[in-house]
């Protein structure tokens, strides 16, 4: 069922300057470590020793750095090991250099969009099956970090997309809770109703990281579940792009650049957009930069195939060449326990990747219900190696969707993806 409407003046979690990065950078950690060592029967029981673990993270700010450091130090104190936390300035570059130089960190943040590249070249230790209660992680997140039928690593946390609506614009248009859009047709109707001379009904990012949600709602995606079949030019994807093209032509949908904004959250906060589609990271940006704006967060409307959203996540990667694999697995087990994930949520606002932690999270952040719901049905990034340049080219096509041909845009994606994946 569609989540009920909520109004919120959100608590501070993330600044607008890091809003884009926050969707892809978060950790499991916190300040409450009440369990006795090994109390849950997890791998930490057998991790005693004197291993020195290097941990590379991409932090969203001081709160995240402090949380992951405190959690790792607590594990080290319990097990007799040592840890060194390195906060990367550019984690993609530093991780690549570490592997290329034969000196990767033992444990590290690994973005879902880059996971397949590292899994394919043998850089990762496939440890996921050694984590207790692995099935407790949301199934779509587990699939995101599965390559060639092997689950490699466990997600630290995750974000999803939802529909944000300004309550002042909603009420000024005479709309009520009964008008919350639950279908594409209803979204088109309210977007048109909310479009005025100075405000666009809906403003969303002009890349696959927002538009892709509509492809999922139509029953499509770039590749099939097997990770090897390219499905870009499917009728379902064409239907999604045609729908959005219609809204762009009607003027009820615009991209941020069309309203002199850097991203959807800025257009939303300044009132240039009545609605936007962003992740739960928007909460901090709104609080920090637009504290007087009341808004609602609801699940994305269903498409022809039903519900659909996108998931953004990172896993705790472990280097295949680590000399302390056993201890690294123990650390990851510790960091991803329910109490640690809830402590991380309290410290800097990330959503737990374990289903059993969702109730506790919603007690802290009830207004995030729409985002949490996406954990059950969200779509992760394209899970195939070598696709980054192909997807960037797809983004370029999407940016020209208003004047472009959906079939041509998808056809180009199909041929480019097949060339990489080897179809």
Predicted regions and their residues:
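Hinge/lid segment of periplasmic solute-binding proteins
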Residues: 112-162, 196, 214, 292, ...
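Conserved C-terminal helix/tail region of periplasmic/extracytoplasmic solute-binding proteins
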Residues: 2-3, 171-172, 177, 376-423
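Extracytoplasmic/periplasmic substrate-binding proteins
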Residues: 58, 241-324
